[in-house]
UniProtKB/Swiss-Prot annotation:
[4Fe-4S] cluster binds at C5, C8, C17, C23. InterPro entries: HCP/CODH, Hydroxylam_reduct, Prismane-like_a/b-sand, Prismane-like_sf, Prismane_a-bundle. GO terms for molecular function: 4 iron, 4 sulfur cluster binding; hydroxylamine reductase activity; metal ion binding; peroxidase activity. Gene3D superfamilies: 1.20.1270.20, 3.40.50.2030. Pfam families: Prismane. GO terms for biological process: response to hydrogen peroxide. GO terms for cellular component: cytoplasm. The keyword Oxidoreductase applies. The keyword Transferase does not apply. The modification Cysteine persulfide is found at C425. This is Hydroxylamine reductase. Its EC number is 1.7.99.1.
Length: 570
């Protein structure tokens, strides 16, 4: 069976990639990622049991989160690293099984599929005798890449034959991938929440359960949105407690004459470590793409060698990384297949990887040594200037709520007629120019609320302000969509409305990968309706599942700029 992947917006033909991913991943990489997800589901069977028995599941929790994150679009293209992850997962699964048995669980090795223990709860995966039946994901084992390849042929997306069940399982899985990304960043800063891990396990096991109906899976998808809100709140707490609340900031987009390091991705812990280790070395630090919001945090402003932001959204990195001249550190997705001209200047860390690119691992104490990349930078020319000037951001919930009287007054007087939430992702497709044109064409009495790399379609336009309030309010990274929800809920309270949908807020969201999926599910959980997704609806939504979202939540897509503005403003 050839590869099949349809988890991102750029799925070939709007259906799925079957030869090579538009993202650049090969058939082998795609299938290995499928196998990682399968192994993770097997681990979840055991870890959910171990958790209920009060056993330590921290190693499994960490592995599940990292593994889900490693399979997100544009995160890891390193076959060796991914195969190692499969091997590690099988060891963790075996360790969990051993712990359960030691704690009183009895495993019938002769039958090889029956659990019998008063300590173990029923998974919901049963046989005709109403006994526990352990899924193949919990018992399959192998120890070499060739056997991995054979197994991977059988466990991909299309292994679920029913189109609607498949759609719901994948929607849930992609929501979990987005959740894992946010949880990883929170965990890196020392923040965790056991209930989120428990839900992830429960949901992963549910995707193996053939007894669950479409209605039951739909309920789980919506529950995923609840935990999406929780994980974004946790990450917001982690970021703001550690680095302070983002504040209105003018960010330099030009360059200086010193050698520099460009840091891309989302991990603020990596940002902190890099700034500390480069201080006093003569090497400057620039953010790229989704790392731009690091400029808004007070804790990072003390570093005089932190210059500003270089470049635009992730998909332009080929030309921008080439022009930067210095080394690039990818802390998370999005990686585009690197050009030979800069591949030797590229470094990955965390769950990211690309074959032939140097990877920086943490030491036993969790610290990362960036000395190699710093010394590399010293040997490089300073960045080539590709633009100059400033952009403004830092409008997360704390900052906007500080401006609440001004904002509320502007709404009451009619100076602001409507807010447009245009959070989400940017991407390669030319149809995404719609969002630039949309921003330009919006009436002058409207304000854009944004988060994520979607901002690059309009954050350098001169759209002016309304009574001193910029018409583009950038809250930060994609996870800072949480801030936009907090702002909306506060406005609902201020205006004494019963329903969040009564606010003068429209949602025109550009999506690309799985973090956008968890943001969408979180908004649905909060009761937001009539969200428009573009430039296309997800390929993983079957007609029937899409119909559920349309009928129950008013989900729509985009048409033309003029038609959409007319529709939103009425």
């Amino acid at each position: 069976m050839s590869m099949f992947c349809y988890q991102c917006q750029e799925a070939a033909g709007g259906r799925g990639c079957t030869v090579k991913g538009v993202c650049g991943k090969t058939e082998d990489i795609a299938k290995t990622q499928d196998l990682i997800i399968y192994v993770v589901k097997g681990i979840a069977i055991y870890s959910s049991q171990a958790r209920e028995m009060g056993l330590n599941t921290s190693e499994a929790d960490k592995f599940i989160v990292e593994s889900l994150f490693s399979t997100i679009t544009n995160a890891n293209f390193d076959a060796k690293a991914l195969n190692s992850r499969v091997q590690k997962g099988l060891k963790i699964r075996q360790s969990l099984k051993d712990d359960i048995i030691k704690a009183g669980g009895s495993y019938n090795s002769k039958e090889n599929k029956s659990w019998t223990s008063k300590f173990l709860s029923v998974l919901g995966i049963k046989n005709d005798k109403d006994e526990k039946e352990i899924h193949d994901a919990a018992i399959w084992a192998a120890n070499n890449p060739e056997d991995f390849k054979k197994k991977a042929e059988t466990v991909g997306v299309l292994a679920t034959e029913n189109e609607d069940i498949r759609s719901l399982r994948e929607l849930l899985t992609y929501g979990l991938k987005g959740m894992a990304a946010y949880l990883e960043h929170a965990n890196n800063l020392g923040y965790a929440e056991d209930s989120i891990h428990a839900f992830m396990e429960k949901a992963l096991v549910a995707t193996l359960d053939d007894t669950l109906s479409a209605d039951e899976l739909t309920a789980l998808v919506l529950e995923c949105g609840k935990y999406g809100v929780d994980v974004m709140a946790l990450l917001d707490k982690a970021n703001t407690s550690t680095y302070g609340n983002p504040e209105i900031t003018k960010v330099n987009i030009g360059v200086r004459n010193n050698p520099g390091i460009l840091i891309s991705g989302h991990d603020l812990k990596d940002m902190e470590e890099l700034l500390k280790q480069t201080e006093g070395t003569g090497v400057d630090v620039y953010t790229h793409s989704e790392m731009l919001p690091a400029n808004y945090y007070p804790a990072f402003k003390k570093y005089k060698h932190f210059v500003g932001n270089y470049g635009n959204a992730w998909w332009k990195q080929n030309e921008e990384f080439e022009a930067f001249n210095g080394p690039i550190l990818m802390t998370t997705n999005c990686i585009v297949t690197p050009k030979a001209s800069y591949k030797d200047r590229m470094y990955t860390t965390g769950v990211t990887g690309f074959e032939g690119v140097k990877h920086i691992n943490p030491s036993k104490d969790g610290k990362k040594d960036f000395s190699e990349i710093i010394e590399h930078a010293k040997r490089c020319a300073s960045p080539k200037e590709i633009e100059k000037g400033e952009i403004i951001g830092g409008f997360a919930h704390n900052q906007v709520l500080a401006l609440a009287p001004q904002v509320v007054d502007a709404v009451k007087t009619g100076a602001i007629k409507r807010f447009f939430v245009m959070a989400g992702c940017d991407g390669r497709m030319k149809s995404r120019n719609y969002y630039t044109d949309f921003a330009k064409a919006l009436p002058k009495d409207t304000v854009i609320l944004t988060a994520g790399c979607a901002k690059y379609k309009y954050n350098k336009l001169d759209l002016g302000d309304i009574n001193g309030i910029p018409r583009v309010l950038d809250a930060g990274q994609c996870n800072d969509s949480y801030s936009l929800a907090v702002i909306a809920l506060k406005l609902k309270e201020v205006f004494e409305l019963e329903d969040i949908n009564e606010l003068p807020i429209s949602y025109n969201i550009a999506w690309y990968e799985q973090k956008a999926v968890i943001v969408l599910l979180a908004l649905l959980h909060l009761g937001v309706k009539n969200i428009h997704l573009g430039p296309t609806l997800p390929a993983f939504l079957s007609p029937n599942v899409a119909k559920i979202l349309v009928e129950n939540f008013g989900i729509g897509t985009i048409s033309s700029v003029d038609e959409d503005i007319k529709m939103f403003m009425n």
